[in-house]
From Swiss-Prot:
Residues covered by the Expansin-like CBD domain: 142-223
Lineage: Eukaryota, Viridiplantae, Streptophyta, Embryophyta, Tracheophyta
Family: Belongs to the expansin family. Expansin B subfamily.
Signal peptide extent: 1-22
Cell location: Secreted, Cell wall; Membrane
InterPro entries (alphabetical): Expan_Lol_pI (IPR007118), Expansin/allergen_DPBB_dom (IPR007112), Expansin_CBD (IPR007117), Expansin_CBD_sf (IPR036749), LolPI (IPR005795), RlpA-like_DPBB (IPR009009), RlpA-like_sf (IPR036908)
Encoding gene, per UniProt annotation: EXPB13
Summary of the function given for this chain in its UniProt record: May cause loosening and extension of plant cell walls by disrupting non-covalent bonding between cellulose microfibrils and matrix glucans. No enzymatic activity has been found. May be required for rapid internodal elongation in deepwater rice during submergence.
Membrane-topology annotation of the record: Peripheral membrane protein
Main location per the UniProt record: secreted
Record-given protein name: Expansin-B13
GO biological-process terms attached to the record: plant-type cell wall loosening; sexual reproduction
Pfam families linked: DPBB_1, Expansin_C
Disulfide bonds: C64-C92, C100-C106
Residues carrying sugar: N32
């Protein structure tokens, strides 16, 4: 019975989004959420799309360029974010804690979600359009009034650099779109490469030899480092 109730309420939420998707913006987006905002809770709105317990398509490149978002580290707990959350791609991979604002109707327990795509539905200053799995983990009855909290930790990336083995020079990459970064160079670069990421708060995170010699395109290499 609880599962049926959740599914029904989720469909109602999705219908509300459809009703406001046409015409000029109804609610302007709020200011960008930054690392300096702190741990205050903000009022937001959450909607749901896809299968009731969906974790996203296997090849869900979206606006961030991620794939296999149903697998680690995302595990389907993902969301599209509007402008102040997506931030022209710089919000890709950011983590948020979200919870329902009505304790009697919801678990009132924060759940962790990742930003993997964008949305432009003008329904709230802060709008999360969640995968079904993430939505169900948060709300028992699908209430669309939510509170959100920026997770402690500075995760928005503003610069990515790489360094060849044996070199002291860090070479800056250019942001192509979303979470996709590239480097244009007249000569081949030789791995392994160390990667240095600068966050919005100024933290520099270095992953030594994160990309091996003989690397291949469309491959994943784990760094085992993260923002504090």
């Amino acid at each position: 019975m609880a599962s049926s109730s959740l599914l029904l309420a989720s469909v109602v939420v999705a219908a509300m989004v459809s009703a406001v998707s046409c015409g000029p913006p109804k609610v302007p987006p709020g200011p960008n959420i930054t690392a300096s905002y702190g741990d205050k809770w903000l009022e937001a709105r959450a909607t749901w799309y896809g299968a009731a317990k969906g974790a996203g398509r296997k090849d869900n490149s979206g606006a961030c360029g991620y794939k296999d978002v149903d697998k680690a580290p995302f595990l389907g707990m993902n969301s599209c974010g509007n402008d102040p959350i997506f931030k022209d791609g710089k919000g890709c991979g950011s983590c948020f804690e979200i919870k329902c604002s009505k304790p009697k109707a919801c678990s009132d327990k924060p759940v962790l979600i990742h930003v993997t795509d964008m949305n432009d539905e003008p329904i709230a200053a802060y709008h999360f359009d969640l995968f079904g799995l993430a939505f169900g983990a948060m709300a028992k009855d699908g209430k669309d009034e939510e509170l959100l909290k920026y997770v402690a930790g500075d995760g928005d990336v503003v610069e990515v650099e790489i360094k060849e083995k044996g070199s002291e020079e860090w070479k800056a990459l250019k942001e192509s779109w979303g979470a996709i970064w590239r480097i244009d160079t007249p000569k081949p670069l030789k791995g392994p490469f160390s990667v240095r990421v600068t966050t919005e708060g100024g933290e520099k995170i270095i992953a030594e030899d994160a990309i091996p010699d003989g690397w291949k395109a469309d491959s994943v290499y784990k760094s085992n480092v993260q923002a504090k």
